[in-house]
Amino acid sequence: KDNLQGVFTPKSDDHFNKVDLKQLSNFDVDTSKFDELPVIGSTHSNTVNTAGLSLVSPTSRTLDISEAVKIAVQRHPEISQNIASLASQNANIDVAKAAYYPQLSGGISTGDMTSGERGRQLLSLNATQMVYDFGKVKSSVDIQKARLALQQAQVLVKIDEVALEVASAIVNLKRYEEVCRIAQQQVDGIARIAEIANLRANAGISSQADPVQAKSYLEASQSNLIAQQTQLRLYQQKLRTLLGFDISRINWKIPENVVTESKIFEAPKINTIPTIMSAQAEVNVAKAQKTQTDLSRYPTLNLVGTLSQALNGVNPNNNKDDGFDSSIKFEASSNFFQGGSVGAQSRAASYAEEAAKAKVQNSYMDILEQIRMTEEQVTNKQRQMQVLVARQSTTTRTKELYQEQYKLGTRTVVDLLNAEQAIHSANMEIENNRYDIYANLVQLISTTGQSRDVYHLNRLSIQGVEVQP
């Protein structure tokens, strides 16, 4: 049965759900209009300064970014949508291939209702086999295959988008965990100063205004803590939505490979970036459509067979009462003139190809800009980290001096409160700076198409689709 079916219908390709990156990336990008991509780094060092980037000790329940990304891509509905579209497009290839196979049709008709033949019924069966068409069917198949490659590239784009969304959420969640910890320390520190101010005011050592001022600072720090906790909970809820379970008791880990495998000091491979692959696939679709339009000018040769049986009346094919007739013939057909539509379609296809090529260049330019922005961010954040660490030491020493001077009465409680705030402000800036570096790195990983390598998604079945490097 399977062998017989293969004679009359095309065999579907069951490998559409395996994305071959070598095949998708088998093209060159013309970057002559732009400068070369920058290699991020400084002339003095070939390593990223990760001082101060150590994480909280893991607890009994720890998840890292790679594990979270794998969970998210397995359940994200937009990836499901793209994969369903991929399967649909694979079926469209079979639709195009069907033109290679015999086309059977049949029906029953009556005679001319305005003549004496109106009582005739004619049963007919027709078979048509395309013999030669100058490659028109092949061009239709090529269009559908190019669209399949485009759909595969769009699946990769969506996987990278989800991976970036998860990684960015984890980085920001870790950021606000640290910021909330520092904000709580600030509340505790100011509360201690307020307690001391109350004791001194009650003892008559200092002004009664000191406790009021301390209370104002305490309330401001408490308000800041609530604001930071709100941001933390927002990212917790975002991750909960992406992963599908409560993540409040999970300790998130940012693995070192986010830094080491981001290849921040290496030029990216442009033709392996999903957005570039998608744009190039659109070029291939436009080229195939142009080829199909050009071939539509040529004739098609078909082998046509017919069977007809008059059920009542005369068979018009042989003029016999209740007659049976059969015939086999060659038939050549061509569209000679359609009001200039073929020429217009050819021009439209040419413009579509140029537009698709421009989209490749635009995608490259966007990537170029993003990488250069990341270069500046990472370079300056590393320089800023050194200043912030020095400031942290200075503010700590300042607070110690102000405490001694406050005891001696040469400093006001406001000076002491400002010193306390300065310490925690410096600590917050260090943490924000640290996680800004991480945020830029995960953005770079996505921009340069390295998400599948860094988060170990290659050769992993993602909702039935496997990415093969």
Protein language model regions, located:
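Membrane-embedded beta-strands of outer-membrane beta-barrel proteins
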Residues: 125-127, 330
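Small/polar (Gly/Ser/Thr/Ala-rich) solvent-exposed segments
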Residues: 80, 103-119, 131-157, 277, ...
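Acidic, low-complexity, intrinsically disordered peripheral segments
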Residues: 1-35, 55-57, 247, 429-469
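Short, solvent-exposed, mixed-charge loop/turn linkers that connect secondary-structure elements
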Residues: 48-49, 56-58, 226-272, 300-302, ...
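Regulatory alphaC helix of protein kinase catalytic domains
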Residues: 40-71
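Amphipathic alpha-helical coiled-coil segments
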Residues: 81-96, 158, 162-187, 192, ...
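Periplasmic alpha-helical coiled-coil/stalk elements that build and connect Gram-negative outer-membrane
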Residues: 26, 158-272, 374-377, 381, ...
